[in-house]
Amino acid sequence: ADGEAVAADAVVVTPDLPVAYERLLDLPPPAVLRRKPRYSPSCVVWHVGVPGEPEPDAAHHIIHFGADWQGAFDDLLRRGVLMRDPSRFVCRPSVHDASAAPAGSQALYVLEPTPNLADGELDWGESARSAMRDRLFGFIERAGYSSAVLTERLVTPQDWADQGMAAGTPFALAHTFGQTGPFRPQNVRKDAPGLVFAGSGTTPGVGIPMVLISGKLAAQRVDEVLR
């Protein structure tokens, strides 16, 4: 940030790849980014602390499916609006990690898929944030979770964008045919020896296992440079 130049044999770039090209790199982006890229849907995540410890038989991961599967995905992928009948994912980390919340309470988060900022016309200002919070509060009440909220944090697509994620999605470039496998941005460039990429925007793709693999591949590339 202060203009200091640091010499290096290899540099691993891990920010979201399109944002790295836009803000950090004085290099032309790969072809898939020069065309109009397709981004994965985004999501809202509501982190909540509530009183009471998890039940002995409580599940760590729970998916609550909506009834109108096709309509929900039409809303998400074609219309670019909030799903009228969404499926939601609930994670209760306190089930297996007592340190996730103080004694006598528990942590959970609720994830609802939403359009990304490129495909949707949603404004995630204070009014929309408040409406989404109320929507998710109503969901946890209906689903039987404790609704006596002690602490909370709502993360929206705009928050993801503010954190440096292209199109406001934490799930990077969509796994379409033209953005998968050999067509996904590669983790090295022939015109920039020693520059290596890792993360969900490069190969092999999205998801914790694949991102971890991308780190392993990046380490191998760095090893090749340093030999």
Language-model segments: residues:
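Short glycine/proline-enriched loop/turn "hinge" motifs that connect secondary-structure elements
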Residues: 98-105, 186-190
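Conserved FAD/dinucleotide-binding core of flavoprotein oxidoreductases
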Residues: 18-23, 49-51, 102-138
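A conserved FAD-binding loop/helix module that cradles the flavin
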Residues: 200-223
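Flavin-binding catalytic cores
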Residues: 53-54, 81-83, 123-161
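Short glycine-/acidic-enriched loop or helix-start segments at secondary-structure transitions
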Residues: 22-24, 182, 207-208
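Hydrophobic, well-ordered secondary-structure elements that form the walls
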Residues: 12, 48, 110, 140, ...
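Mid-domain catalytic core of redox enzymes
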Residues: 1-102
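A glycine-rich dinucleotide-binding beta-alpha-beta segment and adjacent secondary-structure elements
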Residues: 85-89, 144-204
